Amino acid sequence: MAATQYYGTGRRKTSTARVFAKVGTGNITVNKLPLDEYFGRETSRMVVRQPLELVEMTEKLDINVTVKGGGNTGQAGAIRHGITRALMELDESLRPSLRAAGFVTRDARKVERKKVGLRKARRKPQFSKR
């Protein structure tokens, strides 16, 4: 059974997604909920489906995801990254097309920390001339 299941770990911001893909009918489950129930926003659902639509495997794979940390955007990005890695494990010849679409690269942007003496990460306190 393990040979028919493909795994990929995806990360984005503070979210981590563990993605298991196997041949099936196109069901996507996130934390034991259907994709449409888990993500309220259409954009998040679209982001998750992007790699599958690119390689035209939307109806051919069942995907089961466990995702932790972060918010909606981070989780959707992490799932997309994980699905991409699972697809590459399934068929290495998909790598160039996924790379060209920008799904293989891990988005390294994270929230910048707040600095001492500043209001936020870069926002300085208001300056009064007089």
UniProtKB/Swiss-Prot annotation:
Q: Mind telling me which InterPro entries this protein's record contains?
A: Ribosomal_Su5_D2-typ_SF, Ribosomal_uS9, Ribosomal_uS9_bac/plastid, Ribosomal_uS9_CS, Ribsml_uS5_D2-typ_fold_subgr
The protein's matches in PROSITE patterns, at most eight in alphabetical order, are given as:
RIBOSOMAL_S9
Query: Family, per the entry?
Result: Belongs to the universal ribosomal protein uS9 family.
In its UniProt record, which GO terms are filed under biological process?
A: translation
One Pfam assignment: Ribosomal_S9
Q: What is this protein called?
A: Small ribosomal subunit protein uS9
- Organism annotation: Shewanella piezotolerans (strain WP3 / JCM 13877)
Provide the GO MF annotations for this entry. RNA binding; structural constituent of ribosome
Gene3D superfamilies for this protein: 3.30.230.10
What lineage, starting at the top, does this entry show?
A: Bacteria, Pseudomonadati, Pseudomonadota, Gammaproteobacteria, Alteromonadales
